[in-house]
Design a protein with these regions (language model features):
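Amphipathic alpha-helical
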Residues: 194-224, 260-302, 447-479, 703-732
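N-terminal catalytic cores of NTP/NDP-binding nucleotidyl/phosphoryl-transfer enzymes
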Residues: 27-94, 123-138, 161, 245-246, ...
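Residue patterns forming the tRNA-binding/recognition surfaces of aminoacyl-tRNA synthetases
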Residues: 4, 12-13, 17-21, 91-241, ...
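Helix-rich, typically C-terminal accessory recognition domains appended to large enzymatic cores
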Residues: 79, 144-160, 410-441, 496, ...
Length: 803
């Protein structure tokens, strides 16, 4: 009798073997396939079963490609700078460097439990000076190309993390990292001009084999729109206010203007009578987040006391401030057409501002408007020379007319804002800029990089708008690289996204001290073929990575401008009732105990079995027991049958090729949960066949190779048991023969007038006349009327219509 399945002994044996004899070796002859995980930030809580899901999916795909003859680039590293690592260190009362090193050690141990074919020789760590030397090098190159610049501006401010945040880091008005309500703070910031790439970032989405959902999210974030900028003169002053509108055809209906409270003219426009109210309103608005301001709450506002002149008709329009207008979108000022915009209508009604309808269905004005008329088209009314025109046509013509009149210009606008790139924290890459009183902002010479992060005693955020680095005088004070005079270093640090925007390029040449990546290796191994990670990074990391890749392509470092050919977003594994796993909620399931009790192979397969991989799934620990029982049955089947010497008959061949077809098709479609259920079904089928007449060696070996990417340890053990000395991963993925899969006989349904009256077994290739004759025999005396029609759907149904 065969030895029972002992997962502990088998997994220990093969892990040791793989360390000594790696299965994924670059022999220089195979084509490359680059399969990449989104690298983790080393949190203190370690990995839970949700993290495992993505890593298992990527390893299954990598091993599948290995069996298809590729050299697989499958690296791993650490996204270790930034707020998560620093906040954890502060909470634990340790230096972030020390806590980060300890966390990496623990998570690396946990990742190795997965038995993924990671190439640890390629490992990168964003906090390693030899890595962030190149993060700084990229920022210097961007500065020299005019893509990095300083600006005093109101930014998103997290009062808990005590740092500025990019728009992309604010979710529903809260800090993406700590959940605190985000406010606004006016600070000097470093910005990256991602807007210079807006058109390319949008257009090139069409090139990507990515989920449509992600491409749509990026397209909406970039938010391209066409319209016009229109200049309104301020009555009695030399100032002009420019607004951006996508509906220049409604200009005659603009009865007031609204400025963002942060607009540069906001305070200046206040009169003596309104100044106190205006300044109080500006202050209150500064305490709100952008999301709070944009929500559908009752609109607030304050009249400045000043008026602008509508350039199309000379009408005086009052200038208001309201926090529903944001300084960083468009021009920070809008013209308001209350008759045709719900928000403007609500505002006008509240503050008793005139409402002039300029678009009407059939050209008829609505008496006593109760709501805005927001239909996309209609006939122009109350619009001077534009009366009688079709509004949708005028919308296209108006920008040109406005340009010819000299009151504005045709414009394309984007929701995308330049990237706030500085953080007022310690744990990040120092920004390699020196501030000189004479020369201004000057980059640190490239040959002096990396500019290393100094050791500090006190690294907690200050909350003053200055980073803790500002207190280290012997580090801050330096000489200007251009003129040699006394100067000061930039004390803000880069955001966490700086290193993660390009790390995938470094893996393949991580020990190169002369270049970010050699062009030879870049041409040979890049870009990434498959990127696997959570959809929560759709806008942040994925957009930033595309921006960095395009920039590095433009300066000749690489010759491709999109980083990731294919993207797969796995769903989240949640606790009970769909609640996200977190230490604070006490619902984290650690993989460590499950690996001990059931084995790595069982956990790998259960991670795939819980549901479609692209959807969220609720963790139910009882399910892993069923997967473990399946592996036990599979092991027993192989061990019992391996020496029987059975010859393959037609039925065994059919099952073998159907097995190959189903597993391969489901795997290629990323229907990984049905791959596991398929293995279970076919194991039951083969077990039943084994009891009758046995299973041949080739079918057993085929099943082992197919299982290998999913459960590598048991596959290696069984491959060896079949008498092989080489690795199961040195084999070639099996191919199916469609002819061998065909059924000899099929069962069909026999109907009279569409109602089932019996069933019939026929030959798969049997002709129509023969099938109809047999069907009539089955029906017998049930055929008691006049036959009107005989219908045969090959291999499925006979339907006889009688009266």
């Amino acid at each position: 009798m065969a030895t029972p399945y002992n997962h502990k002994a088998i997994e220990q044996k093969w892990r040791k073997h793989w360390q000594e004899h790696p299965v994924n070796v670059n022999d220089g002859k195979k084509p490359k396939y680059y399969c990449l995980d989104m690298f983790p930030y080393p949190s203190g809580s370690g990995l839970h079963v949700g993290h495992w899901r993505g890593y298992v999916i990527s390893d299954v795909w990598s091993r599948y490609k290995l069996l298809n003859g590729y050299y697989v680039i499958h690296p791993m590293g650490w996204d270790a700078f930034g707020l998560p690592a620093e906040n954890y260190a502060i909470k634990m009362g340790t230096h972030p460097r020390i806590s980060t090193e300890a966390n990496i050690k623990n998570i690396k141990r946990q990742i190795n439990e997965i038995s993924a074919i990671y190439d640890w020789d390629m490992e990168v760590n964003t906090t390693d000076p030899e890595f962030y030397k190149w993060t700084q090098w990229i920022s210097v190159k961007m500065f020299k190309k005019g893509l990095a610049y300083e600006k005093q501006m109101p930014i998103n401010w997290c009062p808990s993390c005590k740092t500025g945040l990019a728009n992309e880091e604010v979710v529903n008005g809260k800090c993406e990292r700590c959940g605190a309500d985000v406010t606004k703070k006016n600070l000097r910031q470093w910005m990256l001009k991602i807007t210079a790439y807006a058109d390319r970032l949008l257009a090139d989405l069409d090139k990507l084999d990515w989920p449509e959902k992600v491409k749509k999210m990026q397209a909406e974030w970039i938010g391209k729109s066409h319209g016009a900028e229109v200049n309104f003169k301020v009555d009695g002053r030399d100032d002009e206010i420019t607004v951006y509108t996508t509906r220049p055809d409604t200009l005659h209906g603009a009865t007031f203007m609204v400025l963002a409270p942060e607009h540069e003219l906001a305070k200046d426009l206040a009169t003596d009578e309104t100044r106190e109210a205006v300044e109080e309103y500006i202050y209150q608005a500064s305490l709100k987040s952008s999301v709070d301001r944009m929500q559908d709450k009752e609109k607030t506002g304050v009249f400045t006391g000043s008026y602008a002149i509508n350039p199309i008709n000379g009408a005086k329009v009052p200038i208001w401030l309201s926090d529903y207008v944001l300084a960083d979108y468009g021009t920070g000022a809008i013209m308001c057409v209350p008759a045709h915009d719900d928000r403007d209508f609500e505002f006008a009604k509240k503050f008793d501002i005139p409402i002039i309808q300029v678009i009407a269905k059939d050209g008829k004005e609505i008496e006593n408007m109760e709501e805005a008329y927001t239909e996309a088209s209609g006939i122009m009314i109350n619009s001077g020379d534009w009366n009688g025109k079709e509004s949708s046509e005028l919308k296209e013509e108006a920008p040109k007319i406005i340009e010819e009149m000299g009151i504005g210009k045709k414009t394309t606008n984007y929701k995308l804002r330049d990237w706030v790139f500085s953080r007022q924290r310690y744990w990040g890459e120092p920004i390699p800029i020196v501030h000189c009183p004479d020369c201004g902002a000057v980059p640190v010479p490239e040959e002096e990089l990396p500019l290393t992060l100094p050791e500090v005693e006190k690294y907690e955020p200050t909350g003053t708008g200055e980073s803790p680095l500002a207190d280290i005088e012997d580090w801050v004070n330096c000489k200007c690289p251009v003129c040699g005079k006394d100067a000061k270093r930039e004390t803000n640090t880069m955001p966490q996204w700086a290193g993660s925007s390009w790390y995938f390029l470094r893996y393949i040449d991580n020990k190169n001290n002369e270049e970010l990546v050699s062009r030879e290796k870049a041409d040979k191994y890049l870009p990434v073929d498959m990127y696997i990670g959570g959809v929560e990074h759709a806008v942040l990391h994925l957009l930033y990575s595309r921006f960095y890749t395009k920039f590095l392509c433009d300066i000749g470092v690489i010759d491709f401008d999109e980083p990731f050919h294919k993207l797969f977003n796995q769903g989240m594994i949640t606790g009970k009732n769909g609640i996200k796993m977190s230490k604070s909620k006490g619902n984290v399931v650690s993989p460590d105990d499950l690996v001990r009790d059931y084995g790595c192979d069982s956990l790998r397969m259960y991670e795939l079995f819980v549901g479609p991989p692209e959807l969220d799934a609720e963790w139910d620990e009882s399910g892993i027991d069923g997967v473990h029982r399946f592996l036990t049955r599979f092991y027993k089947l192989i061990m019992d049958q391996k020496d029987k010497g059975v010859e393959a008959d037609k039925e065994l061949l059919k099952v073998r090729h159907k097995l190959i077809y189903d597993i391969t098709t489901r795997l290629n479609n990323f229907s990984l949960n049905t791959v596991v259920s398929g293995f279970m079904e076919y194991t039951n089928t083969l077990t039943a066949m084994a009891k009758k007449s046995g299973v041949d060696k080739e079918t057993l070996e085929t099943a082992i190779v197919l299982l290998a990417p999913f459960a590598p340890h048991i596959a290696e053990e069984l491959w060896e048991a079949m008498g092989h000395e080489d690795s199961v991963f040195a084999q070639t993925w099996p191919t199916y023969d469609e002819e061998a899969m065909k059924e000899d006989e099929v069962e069909i349904v026999v109907q009279i007038n569409g109602k089932v009256k019996g069933k019939l077994v026929i030959g798969a290739e049997e002709d129509k006349d023969s099938v109809l004759a047999k069907a009539k025999e089955v029906l017998g005396d049930k055929l008691n009327g006049n036959i009107v029609k005989e219908i045969y759907v090959p291999g499925r149904i006979v339907n006889i219509v009688q009266k």
